[in-house]
């Protein structure tokens, strides 16, 4: 049996302002070169989202030699496309709704109260960039975690291939969606 990370994950195009460049450099630095694999890892983690990051930091703190493999951006969907972006936009819309109803509370606002969607999106990008510092490659490296970018494929019960390199391990954890395919029997 082999496990492959699905190929439908990709790095979405984003505006390249200073805030986005900061975020991308923390989550997948331009010009990144995967490290030379260790002879054997105590733990290989596939997926650099919240679960993978917590597992990597925790195992490294306990003394394990850890490799983390991510296909796209560290931080996963939650930071980059899901939870964080949606919650910041939801907060803006709720605030607008509260301000629109300010008269109920004895406050008055201009009649032409409007949401500047461009400013709301810029706020979301700033928040994402700030949070990305906690999920950064530098923080993982400081913890002693080897970070590899690329597609992961198990090629034996104790090894995974990523970007042409073979990573041997004692234990592995898939913390992102994976596809299971039965190999030759």
Language-model segments: what does each one mean?
Residues 2-41, 58-64, 69-185:
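Glycine-rich flavin
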Residues 47-50, 71-72:
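Glycine-rich Rossmann-fold phosphate-binding loop(s) that bind the pyrophosphate
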Residues 53:
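Residues forming the Rossmann-fold NAD(P)(H) cofactor-binding site
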